[in-house]
From Swiss-Prot:
Belongs to the PAL/histidase family. This is Phenylalanine ammonia-lyase. It comes from Citrus limon (Lemon). The modification 2,3-didehydroalanine (Ser) is found at S207. NCBIfam families: phe_am_lyase (TIGR01226). It is found in: Cytoplasm. There is a cross-link at A206-G208 (5-imidazolinone (Ala-Gly)). GO terms for molecular function: phenylalanine ammonia-lyase activity. Homotetramer. It is an enzyme of class 4 (lyase).
Amino acid sequence: MELSHETCNGIKNDRNGGTSSLGLCTGTDPLNWTVAADSLKGSHLDEVKRMIDEYRRPVVKLGGESLTIGQVTAIAAHDSGVKVELAEAARAGVKASSDWVMDSMMKGTDSYGVTTGFGATSHRRTKQGGALQKELIRFLNSGIFGNGTESSHTLPHSATRAAMLVRVNTLLQGYSGIRFEILETITKFLNHNITPCLPLRGTITASGDLVPLSYIAGLLTGRPNSKAVGSNGQVLNPTEAFNLAGVTSGFFELQPKEGLALVNGTAVGSGLAATVLFEANILAIMSEVLSAIFAEVMNGKPEFTDHLTHKLKHHPGQIEAAAIMEHILDGSSYVKAAQKLHETDPLQKPKQDRYALRTSPQWLGPQIEVIRAATKMIEREINSVNDNPLIDVSRNKALHGGNFQGTPIGVSMDNTRLAIASIGKLMFAQFSELVNDFYNNGLPSNLTGGRNPSLDYGFKGAEIAMASYCSELQFLANPVTNHVQSAEQHNQDVNSLGLNSSRKTAEAVDILKLMSSTFLVALCQAIDLRHLEENLKNTVKNTVSQVAKRVLTMGVNGELHPSRFCEKDLIKVVDREYVFAYIDDPCSASSPLMQKLRQVLVDHALDNGDREKNSTTSIFQKIGAFEDELKTLLPKEVEIARTELESGNAAIPNRIKECRSYPLYKIVREDIGTSLLTGEKVRSPGEEFDKVFTAMCEGKLIDPMLECLKEWNGAPLPICQN
């Protein structure tokens, strides 16, 4: 997006009262608070949708002030096919600042990094401006890559591409004193998928990301130690990189200030932060949807999403989280079935659901607000000018300041990481309830799906893995920015550690993806187990009813027998008893089903009075025949029901198809190709988790997730008066 107003430098700026799409300072809002607040208008979900839309556009047009998180992430993914175009309107402003530097050199103007040394040794002076820039790049090439046999010390190429894009965007604003041709060359590298190799560590993101950015400059100047990676993963030297990018002008001889312009910025930290926040925002929405599915499979009570509760708390993140969950649960077949169960048997489960379900909006809401605020902070940062000095052509001066201080990156990434850890903690609590038969309202222990629970331990290993993920995530929640060390002869005595914090947040996002993938597979397992439960319960009810009619209705001489009145109470037992508590051996003498069915018959016999003394009217004497007939019939019917379900011919269809959460279930089961996990199958849980994790990393879960919410109008349901 290009802006219509001009600065005194001849480039776009908001100083004269214009308005940037991302809210840069304007004449009517000199402190930028109003536009910062305005940027948070609307729902978080709508913002994420816009982010995804920007990610999917085929071209990123750089003008200096309108770069977005989604665009950075698109370019970071080298296989996305998205191309970068530079706004031609920026050329004049870039040239003006470059010309000013050369003119000032000719006039003998003393400028930091142009005629002086660097940092704590800026008292030194030189007239060899080009040689000074060459030395700057040489001494900053201080990173370590290692041999790669055990571990990689190279910055991920996606982060490097993000940094290249952000740095070009910054330099386009025309305050940096660099030739436009250098920016065009970096853009050609991006468009030809040629990525310089940058060290993973070695920056404190103040004065900018000096060390890693110097390796981009090293490639541009043809330093022999510089390397790049091509589109097919091949390692390239500078000559090969230039040839593949179609740059025929040869390596650059840096002019005064150009080396400093390339390295004195926060682009590596902010570029990685942008890609991290793209993922974090999507994972935040995913956590809301998964919490709603968790409520469905746990037979949760949906009143925890009622708008009045959240309206009275006032926090927008909480209100939106509750509204999203409310939307998914509204009309859910699981919710309807659970409500019926709660009405007929109110004592079967606690009056209130546990905190991991009932307070999930209150827990997730603040995390969403933190992630959203961090997103806005980073979006401002990737559109900021971070050099020192800044070239102000309009006032004919170089401004010496500290925009290279990447504190917005360090702070926003620390905050984001804490939010991610909190989301992971909730997810682990929900997962722990889901696999525990003491809490999960009738699902089998460990979500075992097989016939023999003694040889099927379901998600037990997964719960251990989830505990490990969660523990590491909680450790990563510790801040990075409170570990600042004074650097560079105490000139850089406070520094942001922006890239370090971004790297740790990228790790946290990756771990939350592991947790989300595992949890999603577990939820799909629970959905299928509820389907199995419903079909098995229906089979048991029909079989008990059939046996009761056959054995208890008539006496030996064909007369009506007093035991015929037992059937209704026998069916109540089946309705109230958790199927998975007995279904592996339903007719065992110690089975809770058989014990309670027998107790019904005993109770009726005790009420039968004197008729128990007569063998033709005794209910006690019917118990043996009833149990024998049930033992003959029930195991066979249970196996038939299981087999029919496994073959896709279940008597009762899966309720999930009637729910708004179905798109996520569908992609996991049908498109990704997972299925009910049982001990009888060779396939391990980890194999299924891996499939979903890979799909999540490839962005394949985004559309199904949004499909769950496609009918949401962005508002809570009206507060009902009944």
